[in-house]
Amino acid sequence: MNANWENCRSMVLSVLRIAAGYMFMLHGSAKLLGLPHVEMFDGLQLFSLYGVAGMLELGGGLLVLLGLFTRPTAFILSGQMAVAYFIGHVAGNGYALIPLMNGGEAAALFSFVFLYLAAAGGGKWSLDAMLCKKRQG
């Protein structure tokens, strides 16, 4: 029973990683490539705060999606989302600890999901796991 649960846990971890990476990539893609088009990002400067966030979201999201360098990438992205939460949603708002009221649900959830991935790793279906197997024999 424990072996089955462990196998299932690793697969679910991989599904969480793939889904989070894909959704995060969409945020970066919207900022940098206009896909999907989000009007507020029209004319976005690459080296602005949003532009740098978009680079992290697109590149980091791709790495997380693939499960390559999952732990360090997820750690950086968790920090990015924590900063985004406090700068973009809490600053000047009286609802610091109520994401529903300050619009920061996505940033808070991404931050905690990436923190979990930084601790847990990429899971069974990751390039990290494949490379680790290759090195071991």
What residues fall within each predicted segment?
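Extended, low-polarity transmembrane helix blocks
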Residues: 1-33, 50-55, 59, 66-137
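Membrane-interface interhelical connector segments
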Residues: 33-50
